[in-house]
């Protein structure tokens, strides 16, 4: 079965892709009648060396993404995984020659079709009197025994584009550029690993891998690698890759003894997530530095892909300061990363976390008995939430990811652990602020953020007073913050429904002579009724808002949890005769 591809036609996909790149990049032009992209400022290259490269399509952004000042002059593209036509290569050579360049260097990956076609075009151009040289790049470090065909050309070719481009931009002659990049090409190695195959448009996958296997050392066209290994962690696979490509027992290895300086290239083969790419980059940096290798630059991204192949290749280039300056030289090529000219090894990679600001003076503190009461309230809230864990999870499975109870239990355990460390702040405002930070850090999820917002805002009115009107104002402030940032409103089937209902009842605390427990009892009953009523509501916020209302026939777990917290507070205060 062929895989799905977003193309207009199988036959025209390479042309369409190149046309799209040129259409969106004013510094590029197509060469009429050919699958060739050139710099649009060719006339500015008069008296300089031109650099041409290319190969089969399907390796984007290679090679056309590397056209620009300081890199390639132009690229000749073939059909997917197919060498470009000799006629198009020759047309590109003639085009740059007619623009007044003093010679052309062809940078070619080591594949038979590319060598033959670029080589034939070179000979024809030389017969016409055009100075043309060719460098064949073979940086594959997969095979321990070299075959007659030599090492395959892989992602390291892009580094040759960069070095040659910097030299050409500096006005260096054709012969010297050819000699210098030939030396550089021998000082690097690349090794890839794939989790599964890719597929050419209109065709089946190029190979199959078992679910627990990865292919080590495969080519960028899906060619077989050196062996298949069992799936392992990113750290283990990266360590294996680096060991294989630097081992002296490997005839195609790149020698990287301790103390060496390298440029590291972490290349996405097309289908790897950026998350995985970052993990692999970290593993590669740690592994190399652990072996005493100094990393001058680390280039991470997609440089030479194999269509949608989920895999990665690592390239190591041995560098000294002169070569590093060429890597760092400016370029306008769209696919070259903007990397700081700073050594990776030796750079301070973390900054000390800011110290917490000193607590602002607070005129309100709870007396000893009141402070003990706060501890009892918090302990009972924790016990209540732990007992509701499975019930809340069950309610959440209908409309979310089934972790509401787990999230609230995590908060309860964090609070219980915090209480064991010592007495909580005696100031209600400081207590709520501490709880806010604790929940933001430990509870997680949107619930942690919402409770954190609520408590942070609620703490503000309690800095000056802690009478009943101040506690009512605290409830108002917390609800306002939840609505402002959570974008929920009463009736949206969220925890806000319970808290809002309670908050309306607590307005009575602002009246002179208000009875604290009577009003709180009414507030809790209203919160519980509001929580139960959410089962008849259509969700307007949160994950449940994406679920059909026909499937929501249970109360919202967040609302149930909020009502249960209020009930726990009431029960402790009643037992204490507050």
Curated annotation (Swiss-Prot):
Domain DhaK stretches: 9-336
Keyword Flavoprotein: yes
Gene Ontology molecular functions: ATP binding; FAD-AMP lyase (cyclizing) activity; glycerone kinase activity; metal ion binding; triokinase activity
Residues reported in the UniProt entry to bind dihydroxyacetone: 56-59, 109, 114
Disulfide bridge partners, by residue number: none
Keyword Oxidoreductase in record: no
Source taxon at top rank: Eukaryota
Ranges for domain DhaL: 372-571
Active site: 221 (tele-hemiaminal-histidine intermediate)
EC numbers for this chain: 2.7.1.28, 2.7.1.29, 4.6.1.15
Entry GO terms, CC: cytosol
Keywords: ATP-binding, Cobalt, FAD, Flavoprotein, Kinase, Lyase, Magnesium, Manganese, Metal-binding, Multifunctional enzyme, Nucleotide-binding, Phosphoprotein, Transferase
Residues the entry annotates as binding ATP: 401-404, 446-447, 486, 494-495, 556-558
Cited function: Catalyzes both the phosphorylation of dihydroxyacetone and of glyceraldehyde, and the splitting of ribonucleoside diphosphate-X compounds among which FAD is the best substrate. Represses IFIH1-mediated cellular antiviral response.
Subunit structure: Homodimer. Interacts with IFIH1 (via the CARD domains), the interaction is inhibited by viral infection.
The protein's name in its UniProt record: Triokinase/FMN cyclase
